[in-house]
Amino acid sequence: MRSSLVAAVVLFLTLPVLGQGGGVTADGWQARLDSSRGDVNELSFMSMSDGFHVTTGPHAIFWNSANTGSGTYTASATFMQTKPSSHPNSYGLFIGGRDLDGDGQAYTYFLIRESGEFLVKKRMGGDTEDVTPGWASHAAVNGLENGQQRNTLSVEVGASNVRFLSNGTEVASVPKAGLSVDGIAGVRFSH
């Protein structure tokens, strides 16, 4: 049986303004920064009527432990960037999250950026590895238009492959072996 999680979540991304932040205020959600030198209060992740509003800061993942998947499943979210950035920021989904607040953290992530490019990577502890060969352009990834960007990202975990889709179109498909796929699903923002 195929299940779906993180469905119909709309995230609104804005860029940081000095003094903004406040950390994670959405009920049930947690965050982890890539760097131990960062401060979660430099960013903002809060509930709003249609989903969540995120103001980026340090590179971070956000998750709710209730959003888990195993076997075959789909994780999906719609992202809207509301302001252009002065440099390449990225955001997207992660799946297979394990030990997210520990030294053995592991997950697979699918990111896009306003240039219309995508990237798939995996994290194992403090190390990351490209799953796809670097940032790549794809017509299915909407770029910035009139200062905004909107994309629905999905990760479909099948019996032997994992498909990464933007707006319903596959941008990559890779073997499931070697990826972290069973576990928590959430979102990632890189600034």
Predicted regions and their residues:
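N-terminal signal peptide c-region/cleavage motif recognized by signal peptidases
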Residues: 14-16
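Short carbohydrate-recognition loop motifs
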Residues: 41-61
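Beta-strand-rich interaction surfaces with strong enrichment in secreted/lumenal proteins
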Residues: 60-68, 138-145, 187
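Carbohydrate-binding surfaces in secreted/extracellular proteins
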Residues: 77, 145-175
